[in-house]
From Swiss-Prot:
Residues 291-376 are annotated as: AIS. This is 5'-AMP-activated protein kinase catalytic subunit alpha-2. Belongs to the protein kinase superfamily. CAMK Ser/Thr protein kinase family. SNF1 subfamily. GO terms for cellular component: apical plasma membrane; axon; cytoplasm; cytoplasmic stress granule; dendrite; neuronal cell body; nucleoplasm; nucleotide-activated protein kinase complex. Ubiquitinated. Phosphorylated at Thr-172 by STK11/LKB1 in complex with STE20-related adapter-alpha (STRADA) pseudo kinase and CAB39. Also phosphorylated at Thr-172 by CAMKK2; triggered by a rise in intracellular calcium ions, without detectable changes in the AMP/ATP ratio. CAMKK1 can also phosphorylate Thr-172, but at much lower level. Dephosphorylated by protein phosphatase 2A and 2C (PP2A and PP2C). Phosphorylated by ULK1; leading to negatively regulate AMPK activity and suggesting the existence of a regulatory feedback loop between ULK1 and AMPK. One of its GO terms (molecular function) is AMP-activated protein kinase activity. ATP binds at residues 22-30, 45. The AIS (autoinhibitory sequence) region shows some sequence similarity with the ubiquitin-associated domains and represses kinase activity. The keyword Lipid metabolism applies. Residues 16-268 form the Protein kinase domain. It is found in: Cytoplasm; Nucleus. AMPK is a heterotrimer of an alpha catalytic subunit (PRKAA1 or PRKAA2), a beta (PRKAB1 or PRKAB2) and a gamma non-catalytic subunits (PRKAG1, PRKAG2 or PRKAG3). Interacts with FNIP1 and FNIP2. Associates with internalized INSR complexes on Golgi/endosomal membranes; PRKAA2/AMPK2 together with ATIC and HACD3/PTPLAD1 is proposed to be part of a signaling network regulating INSR autophosphorylation and endocytosis. Interacts with DUSP29. Interacts with ARF6. The phosphorylated form at Thr-172 mediated by CamKK2 interacts with ACSS2. Keywords: ATP-binding, Autophagy, Biological rhythms, Cholesterol biosynthesis, Cholesterol metabolism, Chromatin regulator, Cytoplasm, Fatty acid biosynthesis, Fatty acid metabolism, Kinase, Lipid biosynthesis, Lipid metabolism, Magnesium, Metal-binding, Nucleotide-binding, Nucleus, Phosphoprotein, Serine/threonine-protein kinase, Steroid biosynthesis, Steroid metabolism, Sterol biosynthesis, Sterol metabolism, Transcription, Transcription regulation, Transferase, Ubl conjugation, Wnt signaling pathway.
Amino acid sequence: MAEKQKHDGRVKIGHYVLGDTLGVGTFGKVKIGEHQLTGHKVAVKILNRQKIRSLDVVGKIKREIQNLKLFRHPHIIKLYQVISTPTDFFMVMEYVSGGELFDYICKHGRVEEVEARRLFQQILSAVDYCHRHMVVHRDLKPENVLLDAQMNAKIADFGLSNMMSDGEFLRTSCGSPNYAAPEVISGRLYAGPEVDIWSCGVILYALLCGTLPFDDEHVPTLFKKIRGGVFYIPEYLNRSIATLLMHMLQVDPLKRATIKDIREHEWFKQDLPSYLFPEDPSYDANVIDDEAVKEVCEKFECTESEVMNSLYSGDPQDQLAVAYHLIIDNRRIMNQASEFYLASSPPTGSFMDDMAMHIPPGLKPHPERMPPLIADSPKARCPLDALNTTKPKSLAVKKAKWHLGIRSQSKPYDIMAEVYRAMKQLDFEWKVVNAYHLRVRRKNPVTGNYVKMSLQLYLVDNRSYLLDFKSIDDEVVEQRSGSSTPQRSCSAAGLHRPRSSVDSSTAENHSLSGSLTGSLTGSTLSSASPRLGSHTMDFFEMCASLITALAR
């Protein structure tokens, strides 16, 4: 359990220093946070334990949040981490800079039909994703739809919604009255998904009209309007949109549109990106994915047999089964999203810029990685050799490239934080070339010679990074820019997924405790020139010790 600390007069929780308040919700504040090591900005939602206890959800909230951390959808705010203190939960979430859809509509008025449809398609895709994984929002509103820098929608605040079970009715009345369905404000029983559909209808109306379909300062009058389901449809809305709105804002939940109905509506289907509702015909629910099972074991600290028992039980609400299907679905939707943007010329500033295609400063694509976007999409999927017309064609199967290093799908700043922790543990000395490139040395206690190597983090593909190990010989001088071309690479052990946390006392001092004051080239670092064979063995021993430390 973490403790709150003070950092330069500001509150620090874990590695995050809290800053200004972004908003205030039912259960507490949302503040901007900055990672102390990387400077990465996050949104930190502070949930007061006492307020949560009053709702009688403390017992299940941790388990629910564990699954919410697995949610990966391009239009849902990501939950990275949950930090607990005796008084609060701190939910560390993705930060987007565009603000709320509510503020955007207030400032600019109604949105053009094409843009409104694009945003609504993104919102419905996110809601469908959550419903398929047994989670309902129950408080959808423009204030909970955030916009990124490229005007893409991202839904926030799925954190406190109940896990939805078949046949289970939700009695809790929550949400804002203007967006709440008639059955919610009337205190009647409701199952869950249908109240989100109503709220989506209100959001669509707000996008197209710049106002709310049901609004009144007098709450009893507002409730009467909602129960009656009568709202004004402006003349500029075409008949197709009007029929969709009336179907979504149907008072009787049994007659209300479902997500399937909306997806089949002619207006909704126009210009619908394929990645929003991916279908993978190769996916067979009867085949168990071993990699997904292992990931569930890692996330929940359970055994493979426990996961298999959950899958064979046939209970779709089982937490391990939900997590397994989340992982499968995440892989499918991200693969299709990537293919969609590779197969067509992407719009300027697409969400892929924020997702897979964004390369932080100092982080380079791997030299042997195909460029992510090439003008002609069919060629973009060709092997590298097919693009090299000077290289003779071979009928033999091309061997996979091997690298001495570690591949990971963790965030680049998390990978580097783990590297700093391991190097400090091993008493390595290092110099920072840039945020993702280090020059490292270790003294051989027997010979007294220094062994040197370069650590460079590369972007390998849309989801993977390679921490490349390169030997630095006394005769090799790297460029001042810090760029290093990988030498002929050796085999890597396997996939390593760094832990999400780093010891704070270690991480806070990494930039000072291990840094070198001098250059890592020339005779400054070595009192004697090592023999080539000895240097190579020392280099491999250095690599092995670092890999072992990272695996702990």
